[in-house]
């Protein structure tokens, strides 16, 4: 499950940390997706709310993914659930206009490149 932290961006705001746990402590910078209360209904958004330990409803804005200094990452306040993490992958796919239809397709493409 992906952690939700408070980060010092334009103002202190919740973010989902996208950098994987395994390397986060050794990285100078981490990649995050900000959470906002402005809900536009875009495919590049993932709904979150009180079930994620947030104050109210909002969305993860995958159109605004950014890399920040790890030191700008504050305390952890919540987590994404498994179904939200799946939705996050789809939203990132939309935000970057990637032609990925499934994890299996990616793995098959990687195997073909390696042969």
Indicate where each model-derived feature is located:
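Loop/turn positions that initiate beta-strands
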Residues: 1-4
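C-terminal terminal-subdomain/extension
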Residues: 52-115
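Compact nucleic-acid interaction/catalytic patches
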Residues: 6, 10-50
């Amino acid at each position: 499950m992906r952690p939700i932290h408070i980060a010092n961006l334009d103002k202190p705001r919740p973010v989902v940390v996208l950098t994987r746990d395994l390397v986060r402590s050794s990285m100078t910078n981490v990649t995050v997706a900000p959470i906002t209360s402005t809900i536009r209904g875009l495919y590049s958004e993932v709904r979150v709310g009180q079930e994620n330990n947030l104050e109210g409803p909002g969305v993860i804005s995958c159109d605004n993914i950014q890399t920040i200094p790890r030191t700008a990452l504050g305390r952890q306040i919540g987590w994404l659930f498994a179904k939200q993490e799946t939705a996050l992958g789809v939203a990132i796919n939309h935000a970057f206009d990637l032609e990925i239809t499934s994890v299996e397709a990616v793995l098959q493409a990687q195997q073909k490149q390696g042969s």
